């Protein structure tokens, strides 16, 4: 059984912090045991690790990464004056004359959690703090979020309500102020992206500015590292970045990798053969040897049930590494610019959002615990009402930005010696997306148009999944390639697969390890769990089916069972 009281600090370039406005001696003792530095400012106390220094008014603690004028700023650091952009992945704590100001990046990819008296980047720290004061209560309906629908919608938290009652995830468009022993959530107008239809000219104005932003981000990354890779697929999001590199004449400043196979790989090699670049893989110069069970404990310490699925990369026992820090550029976050969920079946017959539709759609799952369902649906309905937008499409895009994008493309357990960069994070690209009518935005034409700005020919080359003919959709600018799909000639021999240096090292079967844990948890849940419906015949049959298919959806049951036992044991 995982020890949920054991805290593992965040990897670089991040630090961890907790702000307490209650002057709790119990919390002070807990944080001292964790070797956090501390400082009182205006009757509030901040605890932080990694940075051992006194804090002064006007200084800012920075965690994560972002872009400066021509480089990349990496944390953890403390600075007085620094011109940073808001398009990285970070959070900051500024020591203000009246208290503290806590902010995160433009898309909120570095989540912040808070309640009436506490703020932290780590939900587990708030759990430990509340537990020390005997002020802990749980949001037991949280289990329902795991089974609300059977797809990526519920691979992470789905409401602003966390697993701890009274503790919320900070909204993407807000920041926090600590003043006079109180915590205030304030709307940040620079991050409050409203949906408002605008003209074709306005759309392309934003799009061209977004192209400049993305080029700047790419330049900053390339100027900061000589060990940079571009993850290129046959899809549309990473193609934007490849097209940008061709426009900047910097395809030779990155090494291109692709883990995709078949048709996808054929397209990627064809693009590189025609438009330039070189394939390579990171050097495997040493091994990080770990322990599956400890890695799993670290995983739950970091996410503390905010993320439901368990990616293998976070728990594997053998991880090849490069001696030099790797900068990996990917097409992450492209899904925030169109309705990602619509293509996987989450939609409504009605265009206009109605909170009653939340109840009718999300209570369909036969695997939900009916005892907790009503409370969960109330929380989900409240979350949808709070999200930006008036239509179902707009609400789902906003939900994706708040939750799926945060915990899938952000909030990462940073790999040793590697930082994943997302240059598609762009203020102007978001403005361009949100000035389009729903049906046009959801065609995903924005990535096509942006690729076209960088390299018109690349935009019209074939994709892994055929795209629509955008010349027949409004907001189109004419091209000599309209109506065409330019063929790609695969060049598979461009990829020279390197023989793994450590191929003789025995690795455990992660899926088998998960099955062992799942079986143990099912046994424990019969006597130690709060939710015995997880052991029902219906769920057991579902688990057996998932195991037979080696489906990663068993992760949902592992997390749900851990939650059930965790709730019951802490209640006792």
Which residue ranges define each predicted feature?
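Short coil/turn segments at secondary-structure boundaries
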Residues: 164-165, 415, 445-448, 462-467, ...
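Cysteine-centered catalytic environments shared across enzyme families
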Residues: 1-232, 240-287
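Charge-dense polyanion-binding interfaces
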Residues: 125-144, 149-152, 442-475
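Short, hydrophobic/amphipathic alpha-helical patches that form generic packing surfaces
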Residues: 145-155, 394-412, 449-453, 552-571
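Structural motif
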Residues: 137-144, 385-396, 441-442, 542-560, ...
């Amino acid at each position: 059984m995982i020890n949920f009281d054991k805290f593992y600090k965040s990897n670089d370039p991040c630090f961890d912090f907790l702000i307490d406005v209650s002057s709790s001696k119990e919390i002070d003792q807990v944080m001292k045991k964790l070797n956090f530095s501390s400082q009182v400012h205006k009757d509030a106390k901040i605890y932080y690790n990694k940075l051992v220094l006194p804090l002064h008014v006007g200084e800012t603690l920075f965690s994560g990464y972002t872009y400066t004028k021509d480089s990349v700023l990496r944390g953890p650091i403390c600075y007085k004056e620094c011109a940073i952009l808001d398009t990285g992945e970070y959070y900051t704590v500024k020591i203000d004359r009246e208290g503290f100001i806590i902010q995160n990046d433009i898309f909120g990819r570095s989540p912040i959690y808070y309640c009436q008296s506490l703020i932290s980047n780590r939900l587990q720290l708030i759990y430990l703090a509340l537990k020390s004061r005997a002020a802990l209560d749980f949001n037991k309906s949280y289990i329902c979020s795991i089974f609300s629908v059977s797809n990526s919608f519920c691979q992470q938290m789905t409401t602003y309500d966390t697993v701890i009652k009274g503790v919320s995830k900070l909204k993407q468009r807000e920041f926090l102020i600590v003043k006079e022993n109180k915590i205030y959530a304030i709307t940040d107008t620079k991050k409050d992206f409203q949906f408002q239809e605008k003209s074709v000219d306005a759309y392309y104005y934003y799009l061209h500015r977004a192209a400049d932003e993305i080029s700047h981000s790419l330049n900053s990354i390339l100027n900061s590292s000589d060990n940079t890779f571009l993850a290129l697929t046959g899809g549309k999001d990473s193609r934007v970045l490849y097209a940008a590199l061709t426009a900047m004449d910097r395809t030779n400043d990155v090494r291109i990798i692709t883990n995709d196979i078949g048709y996808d790989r054929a397209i990627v090699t064809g693009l590189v053969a025609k438009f330039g670049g070189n394939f390579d893989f990171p050097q495997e110069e040493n091994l990080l040897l770990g322990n599956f069970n400890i890695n799993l404990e670290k995983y739950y310490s970091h996410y503390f049930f905010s993320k439901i699925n368990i990616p293998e990369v976070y728990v594997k026992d053998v991880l090849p590494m490069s001696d030099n820090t790797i900068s990996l550029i990917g097409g992450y976050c492209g899904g925030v610019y169109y309705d990602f969920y619509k293509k996987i079946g989450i939609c409504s017959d009605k265009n206009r959002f109605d909170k009653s539709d939340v109840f009718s759609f999300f209570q369909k799952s036969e695997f939900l615990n009916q005892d907790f369902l009503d409370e969960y649906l109330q929380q989900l309905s409240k979350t949808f009402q709070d999200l930006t937008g008036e239509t179902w499409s707009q609400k789902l895009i906003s939900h994706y930005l708040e939750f799926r994008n945060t915990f899938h493309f952000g909030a990462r357990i940073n790999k040793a010696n590697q930082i994943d960069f997302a240059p598609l994070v762009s203020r102007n690209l978001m403005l361009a997306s949100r000035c389009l009518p729903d049906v046009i935005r959801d065609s995903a034409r924005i990535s096509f148009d942006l690729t076209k700005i960088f390299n018109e020919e690349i935009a019209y080359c074939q994709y892994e999944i055929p795209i629509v003919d955008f010349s027949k959709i409004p907001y189109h600018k004419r091209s000599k390639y309209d109506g065409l799909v330019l063929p790609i000639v695969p060049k598979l021999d461009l990829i020279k697969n390197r023989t793994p240096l450590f191929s003789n090292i025995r690795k455990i079967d992660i899926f088998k390890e998960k099955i062992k844990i799942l079986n143990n948890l099912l046994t424990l849940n019969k006597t130690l769990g709060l939710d015995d419906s997880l052991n029902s015949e219906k769920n057991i049959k579902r688990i057996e089916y998932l195991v037979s298919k080696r489906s990663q959806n068993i992760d949902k049951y592992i997390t749900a069972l851990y939650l059930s036992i965790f709730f019951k044991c802490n209640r006792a």
